[in-house]
Each structure stands twice: as structure tokens, then as C-alpha cells.
From Swiss-Prot:
<dbReference type="Pfam" id="PF02129">
    <property type="entry name" value="Peptidase_S15"/>
</dbReference>
<dbReference type="GO" id="GO:0052689">
    <property type="term" value="F:carboxylic ester hydrolase activity"/>
</dbReference>
<protein>
    <recommendedName>
        <fullName>Quorum-quenching protein AidA</fullName>
    </recommendedName>
</protein>
<keyword id="KW-0378">Hydrolase</keyword>
<comment type="function">
    <text>Involved in quorum quenching (QQ). Inhibits motility and biofilm formation. Could contribute in bacterial competition, as it is capable of hydrolyzing the signaling molecules that mediate interspecies communication.</text>
</comment>
<comment type="similarity">
    <text>Belongs to the AB hydrolase superfamily.</text>
</comment>
<dbReference type="InterPro" id="IPR050261">
    <property type="entry name" value="FrsA_esterase"/>
</dbReference>
<dbReference type="InterPro" id="IPR000383">
    <property type="entry name" value="Xaa-Pro-like_dom"/>
</dbReference>
<dbReference type="InterPro" id="IPR029058">
    <property type="entry name" value="AB_hydrolase_fold"/>
</dbReference>
Length: 304
């Protein structure tokens, strides 16, 4: 993957944008160029932050001439919002809308060539977002969460019952003004967590930057919402071209369900990977997927 001398990436800027009066933090990457460039707006999945391997993808994209805005959802990472670690689907979709609006407002960015890139839970968010924004140039949905019921059924029933109990306790507590009841995002098999498949805990830890203290938990009330979230059902309304990067052995977002929803997308491409949900961020699996994503970008939203 050669770099053009005109596209040598600058160090990212740490920026903020407003989302319903809450400041969201982001890295803004720009290629060295004097012309308006396409912009890729990026965010992570379940409890993830911009520091968890998203910068690796952004660095590859900016080296090819694309600007990137990599943001943290409110309540997470470096973004504002209380209580911390509250995963609220409506708020996160609002953050996507605000991030796109901010990207379109920037100088030397072509507002008609904005791409959105999401992974895991964020891979579902970009589908829901694109269904309501016909101005987007393209969508990349990586190992996406598409169906709350399907993902819930992939879990051990006993774990599901325990999570529901914690969620109800947290929800009731939130009404009474109590502190949030937290539940682990990832844990070893047999432990209660949102992700406890055999590859989940080690895979999640592999995304953490060295020496980081990113919390591995979220407010449990989220469990009451995830089972009712079906972003995959909106794919038939998406007008932009969509690249689905599907992990065939995905333990978190079942690939069979993803493929069913992807088939209803009017303009879509599907790339298969014989990798698990967490493998795609690192090593050879990362090299394969980022190469395919760059190929898609160059064909669909080429840098002028």
C-alpha cells in the first residue's frame, strides 16, 4: 500500500463537537492536500472508544488521501456526559448525526463525499444512520450488530437471565436516583457479562492500548434496550453503497443474521472473513479487512 507524497498524514488533532449540548471528543485526521477531500466518520462498538484500535484503521485511510473523524460516544472515553459508561442507543445515534454534521462543516472537506464506518455495535449504528441520511457517499459496516434478538439468543440462557436481573435493578435504581449498577462488557466463559464467548475476553483485552485504564463495564439497564434494537431491518432504505465485512465465525453478531439483512440492501458488497469477532482488529485479519475497505473506498469514493 504505497503512500502518495501528497497524502502524507498529519498528526491527528484532538477536537470536540456538540451533540445535544454534550461535547463529544474526536481525533481529526487530515491528509496533506489543498483540495477538498472525502471524510470518513468512525466510531466503535459496545463500550469501545476511539483508542481501541480505531486509530490503526484511520491511519491507513488517511495515508490513502481520506480525512477521518474518529469519535467517542457521550458517556464514554474522552467525551462528556453523566453518568459515565451509560450506553444509550438513542443518544449514540444522535452522536452519529452530530458527528456527520460537524464533518460536513469543516473546511477542505467535500460535504457530499462523507463515508460512515462502524464496527460491532457501531456497525449497526451506521446502518440505522444511513437509512435516514441519503446524502452519505458510502457506508462500511464491520462485523455489525444487526439484530438484538439474534445476538441475545447467541448467549447462554442463564447468563441472559442474570443480565436481565441486573438490568431491572439498574433501571429501578436510576428512577430512584441510585448509582448505576454496572455489568462487565467482556469476561471469561462462565462469568456474567455482555460478551462471554470463549474468544471474547482475550479478544477484548487485545484491543486495549498498552497501559490504558479503559473501563470494562457499562450500566446494566442497556440490556433492556439491546434486545429491542434491530438496525438490520432498516437496510432496505439505505441508498448509499454499503460494504459489509462479515466474520463467518462471529460469536457476538451472528453472521447468518447479518447476511440476511445485508441481502436487503439495494447497493451492497459483502466480504467474508474466516475470523472471529475480535480477530479482525489485529494481525493478518486486520491487514485483510483494511485492504478490502481501502479498495471499496477507492472505487466508490475516490480521492480526486
Amino acid at each position: 500500500m504505497g503512500k502518495s507524497l501528497n497524502n502524507v498524514p498529519q498528526a491527528p488533532l484532538d477536537v470536540q463537537f456538540d451533540s445535544n449540548d454534550v461535547k463529544c471528543s474526536a481525533y481529526l485526521y487530515r491528509p496533506t492536500t489543498e483540495v477538498a477531500t472525502p471524510m470518513i466518520v468512525m466510531a466503535h462498538g459496545l463500550g469501545g472508544t476511539r483508542r481501541m484500535r480505531l486509530t490503526a484503521f484511520a491511519e491507513r485511510f488517511v495515508a490513502e488521501g481520506y480525512a477521518c473523524l474518529v469519535f467517542d460516544y457521550r458517556y464514554f472515553g474522552d467525551s462528556e456526559g453523566q453518568p459515565r459508561q451509560l450506553l444509550d442507543i438513542k443518544s449514540q445515534l444522535e452522536d452519529w448525526k452530530a458527528a456527520i454534521a460537524y464533518a460536513r462543516s469543516l473546511d477542505k472537506i467535500d460535504p457530499n463525499r462523507v463515508v460512515i464506518w462502524g464496527t460491532s455495535f457501531g456497525g449497526g449504528h451506521v446502518l440505522a444512520t444511513a437509512a435516514n441520511d441519503n446524502r452519505l457517499a458510502a457506508v462500511i459496516s464491520q462485523c455489525p450488530f444487526t439484530d438484538g434478538f439474534s445476538s441475545s439468543m447467541a448467549m447462554n440462557p442463564i447468563t441472559t437471565l442474570k443480565l436481565m436481573g441486573l438490568a431491572l435493578k439498574d433501571k429501578i435504581g436510576s428512577i430512584l436516583g441510585a448509582k448505576p449498577v454496572m455489568v462487565p462488557l467482556a469476561a471469561p466463559s462462565g462469568h456474567t457479562a455482555l460478551m462471554n464467548a470463549p474468544d471474547a475476553y482475550s479478544g477484548y483485552l487485545a484491543l486495549m492500548p498498552s497501559g490504558s485504564n479503559i473501563p470494562n463495564y457499562v450500566a446494566a439497564r442497556f440490556v433492556l434496550d439491546i434486545i429491542r434494537y434491530y438496525p438490520g431491518r432498516k437496510t432496505s432504505r439505505i441508498q448509499a453503497p454499503v460494504l459489509f465485512c462479515v466474520c463467518d465465525t462471529d460469536s457476538v453478531a451472528p453472521s447468518k443474521t447479518t447476511l440476511r439483512h445485508a441481502s436487503h440492501t439495494p447497493n451492497h458488497e459483502i466480504k467474508h472473513y474466516a475470523d472471529g469477532h475480535f480477530e479482525i482488529y489485529v494481525g493478518e485479519a486486520f491487514e485483510r479487512v483494511v485492504r478490502d475497505q481501502i479498495d471499496f473506498l477507492k472505487r466508490i469514493v475516490p480521492v480526486k
